[in-house]
């Protein structure tokens, strides 16, 4: 027990009495121990002594409880005093750090005023960063350093000024203002650049025009770059893993696009020697499911590897950029947003291509956003979207190391200004596969490593390669045979001519893949039902029948001319379609009642 506690404890009546009794007992004990002979009254004295000791013990226990109670009360009083002091403190203010001075003072923006204040001794001014939030006491002294502001207004970066610390931003009402850049937005090595260095070297490398910045307009600071989710979702920056060897039946088209895209990048010196301008864009058009998107992906993959070989790099680390633009998702209901997205996409392409790396901008379903102006087919959005694309392709800035590839199955709906030479120079039609091309496509999906039924293998002496080849030949012969089972449609043209079309006239690479997938599924079901493992020719033939049966209802007999354009049958206008699939009723055929519905196509 401390002296203070002892004094407080002895200040109570019980403590004083305990101390008096303790002294009395001690005196009596000394008398008893000092007497040489004990008289008859000694036993009574001993009894009184024991009673006194018991009373002392009781009082000691009581005194200990009182001491504990006093200690607890003291702690509660101290806690209440601290709480009262805390509640009585004046409020603290917050401000934005603007600059640190050499005399350990700082400039802050607080309550709408710019002030120079002092810092608490426990604040290291060297660790403070511009744009940081600081806490001020009632004397306007910095007592705590906080984080950077995480809420505010969103402004668009127009440009970074030459000093590298300020930027021109545009607000929602197109109001331009100059703001300071917080330290996180400045290049990490900015502090290592000498003051007499060129201003261009001081520009933050992480910022680019068009970025969205979090801005405190009152303090005049930009704190953070906000990712633009709407553009990130539309663009896929990666090299696809599709090669030309994965594409079947399109050898001629592949050669055309390699001449248009790869030659200018791989042989720039020859193009310059002959004063030949590389094409700026390629249009891949044709019926759906015939490999337009697949070719565009293979171009990016092949170009990246060829450029890596040309530079002497490892082809496995080949680098190029394939910006896959989802056409329909570009459209935005707000005026000017679609055009802004297109500007940002080409701005990103220019940045990626600035170091000589090839960049491919691929617009899938191009007709959905770049339709002919003034047709009335859709809204008037194309009147501003099309000129934006035209200005990006061959505007003042120009495109270096950037190739635009568009894919569409309705090239007749794309604005003619986009298709003229100098923009999308090369136009490659992706035809429907013929019998030879179909065999090539089947060979990509029916490979020798697939399990083949033992009976089919036995027919060819156990040679797996010959068995697979025979499977492909038989299924192609069945698919392309001009027999009654393969009759699909009878079309009537405007001049009265009629023509019978077979399923082979509407075949595509996607349909072939679907046939093989059906056959594989049938083979799996056979294993589960019969226990016999392996793919059979009959599985493929049954899959063809099922695939044809699913497609028999697909022709649009309400608007046959429109359907014919999508399906790839162009030429004389079609006015009547009659399905010839067995079991179909004659009611499936339908003529065109009026020509008004076809006015936009004539």
Curated annotation (Swiss-Prot):
Pathway: Protein degradation; proteasomal Pup-dependent pathway. Keywords: ATP-binding, Chaperone, Coiled coil, Nucleotide-binding, Proteasome. Residues 13-89 form a coiled coil. GO terms for molecular function: ATP binding; ATP hydrolysis activity. The keyword Chaperone applies. ATP binds at residues 289-294. GO terms for cellular component: proteasome complex. InterPro entries: AAA+_ATPase, AAA_ATPase_domain, ATPase_AAA_core, ATPase_AAA_CS, NA-bd_OB-fold, P-loop_NTPase, Prot_ATP_ID_OB_2nd, Prot_ATP_ID_OB_N. GO terms for biological process: modification-dependent protein catabolic process; proteasomal protein catabolic process. Residues 601-602 are annotated as: Docks into pockets in the proteasome alpha-ring. Homohexamer. Assembles into a hexameric ring structure that caps the 20S proteasome core. Strongly interacts with the prokaryotic ubiquitin-like protein Pup through a hydrophobic interface; the interacting region of ARC lies in its N-terminal coiled-coil domain. There is one Pup binding site per ARC hexamer ring. Upon ATP-binding, the C-terminus of ARC interacts with the alpha-rings of the proteasome core, possibly by binding to the intersubunit pockets. Belongs to the AAA ATPase family. HAMAP family: ARC_ATPase. ATPase which is responsible for recognizing, binding, unfolding and translocation of pupylated proteins into the bacterial 20S proteasome core particle. May be essential for opening the gate of the 20S proteasome via an interaction with its C-terminus, thereby allowing substrate entry and access to the site of proteolysis. Thus, the C-termini of the proteasomal ATPase may function like a 'key in a lock' to induce gate opening and therefore regulate proteolysis. PANTHER family: AAA-FAMILY ATPASE, PROTEASOME-ASSOCIATED ATPASE. Consists of three main regions, an N-terminal coiled-coil domain that binds to protein Pup and functions as a docking station, an interdomain involved in ARC hexamerization, and a C-terminal ATPase domain of the AAA type. This is Proteasome-associated ATPase. The gene is mpa.
